[in-house]
Amino acid sequence: MAEETMENEERVKLFVGQVPKHMTEIQLLTLFREFSIVNEVNIIKEKTTRAPRGCCFLTCPTREDADKVINSFHNKKTLPGASSPLQVKYADGELERLEHKLFVGMLPKNVSETEVQSLFSEYGTIKDLQILRGSLQTSKGCLFLKYESKEQAVAAMEALNGRHIMEGANVPLIVKWADTEKERQARRLLKVQSHVSRLDPQNPSMFGALPMSYVPPYNGYGYHVPGTYGYMLPPIQTQHAFHNVISPNQGNGRALQGTALTESVPPRLAPRRNFPTALGNYGYHGLQYPMAFPRGMIPPRLPLTTVSPGISNNGTSIPSSLQTEGPAGANLFIYNIPREFEDQELAATFQPFGKVLSAKVFVDKATGISKCFGFISYDSQAAAQNAINTMNGCQLSGKKLKVQLKRDNGQQQQQQQSKNPLFNGLLNS
């Protein structure tokens, strides 16, 4: 049993693009085995139709066998029915896994390479160690290191990750497998998936489903499975009290005109600060959403045009320079955002109150960890005010949100001038 497990860990997975859709797994296996040892081939198919997507994974017993396949086929052989040569590369994360490469974060900025060597060498032989530094050669508080074997890397992770605090730091070390940007994107999307259920056509979403890809493309060669996630409510027709409660916005900014909660509403939906509480366990854990939002129920599938380019569809952070500002009084500052939230989650949370032009969660450049604050921009002041009235003080994942208008430079300058006696004297004269 142990030998079988070790054999599986040594296997190497390759991604192959530009595969003719008419070819079968047996045909591909025969082709690749002419040049190297290949254990199996798995054609990647559409999730719903099961039609081939023109790419596949293949598994080799060792890295040497995998390199033979890459050297023999990558950009060198065009199969009948294909327009371009085969693209053969390591699947995402394989190189990092094979090299036993670790990422270490939350290091003191003044840590030396000798200190790190001394700590991590207790768990095995270090082949390579690289402290990440900025333009002024100052440490970013993180590093990459490689061990001689996987067992040594695992031992270091188990002993140090979240448990050891280095001298000069106030938080434990983060020790994990190094990953690629594509893997980080996939992890963000999976994190979103853990908060929500899959969208069902019979169950409309309160927030709609922000279009996003299920997993990122492998090596950029077309393996891209489309998918959406929505925040589901129970079927509307089964909620007998809903027609007495939910009233769409008619343009006057009031969503609860002349409506009241009836006795038929379950206790868990009783009013709280003039808003009903969250419906069951849907939506984000810990956030008490109102049943009636200022803009009423939003369709389950929002078109891409309703979200500005400032909100990425693949889960990556967008630089502040690309932020889309709303009109004066329509931009919000959000504090105490849950640490696991990113741009997409923030946008989805504030989408019910109006058209979101952009959403940004600020992260530490060195560690990639959220700073727990960000900004939301709406297309109108009314939407921003509705968001403040509803969300300020709400509990979200155990944190009490602080939602207020973002101060622009003009307001700050005016406030500073108003405090200046000379400026006040000129006004009075």
From Swiss-Prot:
Residues 12-93, 100-180, 330-408 form the RRM domain. GO terms for cellular component: cytoplasm; ribonucleoprotein complex. It is found in: Cytoplasm. Pfam families: RRM_1. One of its GO terms (molecular function) is mRNA binding. It comes from the Eukaryota. The keyword DNA-binding does not apply. The keyword Repeat applies. Its main location: cytoplasm. InterPro entries: Hud_Sxl_RNA, Nucleotide-bd_a/b_plait_sf, RBD_domain_sf, RRM_dom. Residues 418-429 have a biased composition (Polar residues). Keywords: Cytoplasm, Flowering, Repeat, Ribonucleoprotein, RNA-binding. Residues 410-429 are annotated as: Disordered. RNA-binding protein involved in the regulation of flowering time. Acts as a repressor of the activity of SOC1, a transcriptional activator of flowering time. Binds to the 3'-UTR of SOC1 mRNA in the cytoplasm and participates in SOC1 mRNA decay, mediated by the distal region of the SOC1 3'-UTR. This is RNA-binding protein BRN2. The lineage of its organism: Eukaryota, Viridiplantae, Streptophyta, Embryophyta, Tracheophyta.
